Amino acid sequence: MKKINTFAALLLMAAAAMFSTSCENDNINPYDYVNNGGNGSEGNENQGSKDVITTKVAEYPKGSLVWSKDTTLSESVEIPVGTSLYIEPGVTVTCRSEVQVPVEIVVLGNLYCLGTAEKPVTITSDTKKPADWGGIICGYNSEEVVLNHVDVAYAGATPTESSASFQNKLFKTTIDGGVPAFHFCNVNGKFVMANSFFHDNYNDQTYFTGGNGLIINNIFADSGNAADGGEAINVKAGCKLDVANNRS
């Protein structure tokens, strides 16, 4: 447990240090990096940047994806193994609901949502209704995820056979009540979920089937649906977690 606390502290300290850097660059178009090889404007193969990326917030290593501006998703985004997606403070990611296949953020690599108290990261939907989109679904090889000062809302849609979560064998189409808003399953992976607000999600707010993590200072509200109340923190075997100061 002490090792996990050290990991969490180092990640959050690193995030704070990054915020002191000042550079410039435009945001990467998310559609350059979508779904199994990508069909972006330049035929990007969904492996992140070939060069160091600098923004007004920080400098990111090669192989990164960086969202520094508000982003609207009309299809799922898949972050490949070995690639890291960084979402900067104050960014709002809006998932469209009127789509044939529910939008999902499937993290096979790493995800760092680096919000602050003043500028949280928001992941929401366009119509603000539960089950408008799927959720943040991490794969079996996802190594690290940080959700710090993140507002996650209106997730919980049921996947189809065309969904990225189904294609990667993470969830079935017969799941009861839709996918959770955040799912982590790598027993050797690490995650931090801190200072975040999960609300109005159709199924469980979070669901863990593996991993070493810290869950601290989060708020969970309006979980589940009329048939199934949903759980704030649903933990199964294969997890080693420190959980403290959460409210629901």
Describe the predicted segments one by one:
Residues 1-9:
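Bacterial N-terminal signal peptides that target proteins for export
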Residues 9-17:
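Hydrophobic helical h-region of N-terminal Sec-dependent signal peptides
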Residues 19-22:
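C-terminal motif of bacterial Sec signal peptides marking the signal peptidase cleavage site
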